[in-house]
Amino acid sequence: MPIRQLRPYFLCACLLLTACNPLINFFAFHPDASYIQPSEALPPGTEEIFFEAEDGVRIQALHLHNPSSDIITIFFHGNAGNIYRRLNDYRRLRRLGTGVFAVSYRGYAKSQGSPSEAGIYRDGKAAFDHVTKVMGYPAPRIFIFGRSIGSTVATDLAQDKDIAGLILVSPLSSARDQASVMGLGFAAPLTGNAFENAKKIKRLKAPLVVIHGTRDRIIPIGMGRNVFDAATSQKYFHEIEGAGHNDLSNRFAAEYWTVISDFLKQSAKNR
């Protein structure tokens, strides 16, 4: 194979060498700061909020109010696009009986800075602090929702917290496992402790639901099972037959949203 054809594989290998390497940030995050919806285009009852992470970076969030509910869901999206491209998901989630606090990672949409693993964990902590300390929600009335790379923020944040529940959609288990999936097993030992979902989930106290498509080629369902198997709290695993990585909430909407609705109702009732 010509050297130029091998270049992407070398770049991916470099990405996986260490969580501190800028290359991992380059390949792991694909922020979009250009697609911004005007306020009048947002769902009714949506408030734009800004708060600061502990390192001073200004972070944006959208709060979809739900006056008929005393619970709220902090939502962490995937690695591409931004919060404005997921408005339909937020609307659907609110219709299930929860307020929604959708967080824009640093470097995405109107948030300042550049994304990194450590940085998005700071953003998650700051979001939780804002929801509890400024908005006044007690932890037992808060759900945390993470999809794809957002599962890493959600899991990191949920550790040891007395929250209502954790929802993980298509979660990765670790950078090490992702390296193997990409055919870069030789680099797996060098990934350190990057994105260690399966390790961190052991410190989860709250109920957990993991949702994964059986035909996910980006983060295979085996990773979701690894995360699920490592959890020791009350837990549920739901596989959606035939679903891939990016079509769960639309093509398989009926099944997907029913699972989430049932989990919200059951977990909130028990708190």
Residue spans for each PLM region:
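Hydrolase active-site cap/lid region
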Residues: 151-206, 254
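Acidic catalytic loop of the alpha/beta-hydrolase fold
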Residues: 215-219, 246-247
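Short beta-strand/loop motif that positions the catalytic acidic residue
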Residues: 203-205, 210-212, 216
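An N-terminal hydrophobic leader/cap segment in hydrolases
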Residues: 17-52
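C-terminal catalytic histidine-bearing segment of alpha/beta-hydrolase fold enzymes
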Residues: 225-229, 233-271
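Alpha/beta-hydrolase fold nucleophile elbow
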Residues: 137-148
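Short alpha-helix in the alpha/beta-hydrolase fold that links the catalytic acid
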Residues: 89, 197, 206, 220-229
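Membrane-embedded segments
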Residues: 54-130
